[in-house]
Amino acid sequence: MPEQDHLTMTDIVVSPHFDDGALSVASTLSKGPSALLLTVCGGAPTGAGDDEWDRLCGFESGPAAASGRAAEDRAAAALAGHDVVHLPIPDAPYRTAFPTAAVTAALAPLLRPDVRVWAPVGIGSHPDHVGTRDAVLTAAAGTGCQLLFYADCPYAFGSGWDAADRDRPPADRWEPQLAALAHLVDVDCPRITRLDDSTMRLKIAMLRCHASQLAGLSVDHPHFMAWEGPLRQEVFWPASVLAPSLEPTLGSSA
């Protein structure tokens, strides 16, 4: 659990992987000590196998990737001044079903009516992103916390922020994932945040801490780190009501 008194936290960013918070919600993480970044897939796999992405990023094994990326995340957090929590859950390539029950149990003690909880929409259709979203929905039910859903970067801007959904690759389309949240958010009225220079400077510095990921991300998203590039924008959908008693609409196995 977080090092600081969790009663002082106003914002909890729930990130599927180590770099997703910095990529998508830097405007909130820039608040420093009042924010907490909780990474769901923050654990090492039990075996010594490897994944193609981890190999591309320079890691010889899954455990090496988990250790190295956790260190990168702590370095990024030190720049912004926020605390981090890494749940002991490995990435999707190293497990079978998403552990919804374990994630829900870890989140539950942190959720209060005066806390804003930031969760991924699930754009990109990655099982860890969709599973994280659904676990947040389950954990938040009945707590009264304020839910906000963020556009998952880089999937969300891969074809351009303003692209028509039909022109995006099927997995990166926004509409199917937003449809799962239509009972909570106004799908057609996102909150668009353009980062000021100070926050953009911090965001770039945080992402440079996640150095292992940059080469791989640049293959499909060249120049995404440009000063006036797509990272300058962040997109959110606030829930129109406080977290009600509800069931996730696109659940993952517990």
Q: Residue spans of the language-model regions?
A:
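Active-site beta-strand->loop->alpha-helix modules in alpha/beta enzyme cores, enriched
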Residues: 1-142
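The feature marks non-catalytic terminal segments
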Residues: 2-3, 69-87, 92-98, 142-254
